[in-house]
UniProtKB/Swiss-Prot annotation:
This is Large ribosomal subunit protein bL21. Belongs to the bacterial ribosomal protein bL21 family. The gene is rplU. SUPFAM superfamilies: L21p-like. PANTHER family: 50S RIBOSOMAL PROTEIN L21, LARGE RIBOSOMAL SUBUNIT PROTEIN BL21M.
Amino acid sequence: MYAIVKTGGKQYKVAEGDLVKVEKIEGEPGASVALTPVLLVDGADVTTAADKLASVSVNTEIVEHTKGPKIKILKYKNKTGYKKRQGHRQPLTVLKVTGIK
């Protein structure tokens, strides 16, 4: 059984026992989080009806908070000597799917 959930502006296909890296979610490691905007559930049959999906939630547990890979940004203007360097690491949360109900 799997489900497609939406969190942090992205969609993820998850099944029970999966580890998923998502945009940062507030909470301590070990805390439970329910991902409610479920878009699709596939069990005995595929369900996409909004009225049936309103009662479905994906239960997860926060494993850890981490950061994504470093992204390097460079602005450069020709002939003026203007250079600007910047970097960014996106904060992420690792979730373990404990159940789909």
